[in-house]
């Protein structure tokens, strides 16, 4: 069900036959890449890790790309210019919160490597599940409380730093496509309570 909704939303929003996918080892980004694959798009996956610090996510992104026949480019993010990078994030991207900096910093180096016009992402999908400590303690017990948590999470100025990431995409003249933030996907998840989404 959700895979069809994601495919439908991606078909509506993506106009290019060659697309970039921000790929990690997680199901959110993989589900977007698989949807693009089903739509017969040529996928170039982009993943990253800090210089000399390979990660599970980058390794898994390469593994799934090899299995699926996608090109995968791993970007090594340098750490020797962090002070200037963070100043740039404040001035150009308007980062304020710690999470803004953490989520945006690597993409200062990823986006210049992306050749495709459209950049697909599973951005903010984890917000639907309420897996944070805060959600587990305070919001999972009734659907009303769970919806309250999700309503706050998906406010425009939250969404896991979506607005700040999009500024980087815009700066590089890329179209940032996030199917998990579309209304039909939201409605699917909003029909479920915490237990339906998190228990077998």
Provide a role label for each language-model segment.
Residues 1-200:
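ATP-dependent adenylate-handling active sites, centered on carboxylate activation for C-N bond formation
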């Amino acid at each position: 069900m959700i895979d069809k909704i994601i495919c439908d939303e991606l078909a509506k929003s993506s106009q290019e036959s060659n697309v970039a996918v921000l790929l990690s080892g997680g199901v959110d980004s993989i589900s977007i890449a698989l949807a693009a694959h089903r739509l017969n798009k040529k996928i170039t996956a982009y993943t990253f890790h800090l210089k000399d610090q390979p990660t599970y996510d980058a390794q898994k992104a390469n593994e799934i790309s090899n299995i699926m026949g996608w090109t995968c480019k791993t970007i090594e993010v340098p750490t020797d210019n962090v002070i200037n990078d963070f100043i740039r994030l404040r001035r150009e991207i308007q980062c304020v919160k710690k999470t803004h900096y953490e989520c945006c910093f690597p993409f200062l180096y990823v986006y210049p490597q992306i050749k495709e016009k459209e950049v697909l992402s599973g951005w903010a999908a984890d917000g639907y599940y309420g897996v944070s400590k805060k959600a587990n303690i305070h919001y999972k017990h009734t659907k009303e409380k769970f919806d309250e948590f999700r309503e706050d999470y998906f406010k425009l100025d939250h969404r896991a730093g979506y607005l700040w990431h999009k500024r980087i995409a815009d700066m590089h003249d890329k179209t940032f496509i996030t199917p998990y933030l579309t209304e039909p996907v939201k409605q699917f998840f909003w029909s479920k309570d915490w237990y339906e989404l998190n228990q077998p």
